């Protein structure tokens, strides 16, 4: 079956480490607008911001992007995009749903395209991205999520686990997980039906919920890592990059 993708960008106002970060100004535009612009440049399908706040919706609309207002009580971005999908597409026209975090203003369109590739394998439930860790400090940084996976090809892994620790042990590359997901529609429906899992809660990584329920996640390896904005320091770095 051919893939019919839609891009959904979850964006909430209540960030704890960097309040109102979706609206943080970067080169004259709110951060969420930068993400939406990059997603549209990928030209793979309809792009919609799913948000819980009117101020984010207004900012997105001012730059000509589509949005939908969702409930404010969602526990994860996946839950938010699922609500959005059910309301936007009850006819089930879209069978591949890309979840792009709203705090990745440096994401490149080619990386969004690459995130879809593992879904070409009909056995893959969820696709995501990773990149080899080069900086030694990142190997020990708990904010850098590592992928433990078995190689499927030169540029693809099957994920066995995700962790904040330095892993796996021994010689060989370590991979940094990039928080972009491409779900088969039925996989997203299945994922959100499960309660948060034991390891998900412990590691604070929602993708572990899928692995704990025997869902298959394949990882496309790319050359660059988009900078996620979680702190004021991250924001200042991104402002310099996009100046």
Swiss-Prot record:
Keyword tags: Cytoplasm, Lipopolysaccharide biosynthesis, Nucleotidyltransferase, Transferase
Chemical reaction(s) catalysed: 3-deoxy-alpha-D-manno-oct-2-ulosonate + CTP = CMP-3-deoxy-beta-D-manno-octulosonate + diphosphate
Catalytic activity, EC: 2.7.7.38
Signal peptide: none
GO cellular component: cytosol
First-tier enzyme category under EC: transferase
A Pfam short name: CTP_transf_3
Pathway membership, UniProt: Nucleotide-sugar biosynthesis; CMP-3-deoxy-D-manno-octulosonate biosynthesis; CMP-3-deoxy-D-manno-octulosonate from 3-deoxy-D-manno-octulosonate and CTP: step 1/1; Bacterial outer membrane biogenesis; lipopolysaccharide biosynthesis
CDD domains: CMP-KDO-Synthetase
Key word Cell wall biogenesis/degradation present: no
GO molecular function, one term: 3-deoxy-manno-octulosonate cytidylyltransferase activity
SUPFAM superfamilies: Nucleotide-diphospho-sugar transferases (SSF53448)
GO biological process, one term: CMP-keto-3-deoxy-D-manno-octulosonic acid biosynthetic process
Localisation per UniProt entry: Cytoplasm
Top-rank lineage group of the source organism: Bacteria
Entry's family note: Belongs to the KdsB family.
Function: Activates KDO (a required 8-carbon sugar) for incorporation into bacterial lipopolysaccharide in Gram-negative bacteria.
Xref: PANTHER family: 3-DEOXY-MANNO-OCTULOSONATE CYTIDYLYLTRANSFERASE, 3-DEOXY-MANNO-OCTULOSONATE CYTIDYLYLTRANSFERASE, MITOCHONDRIAL
Name of the protein in its database record: 3-deoxy-manno-octulosonate cytidylyltransferase
Natural source organism: Bartonella tribocorum (strain CIP 105476 / IBS 506)
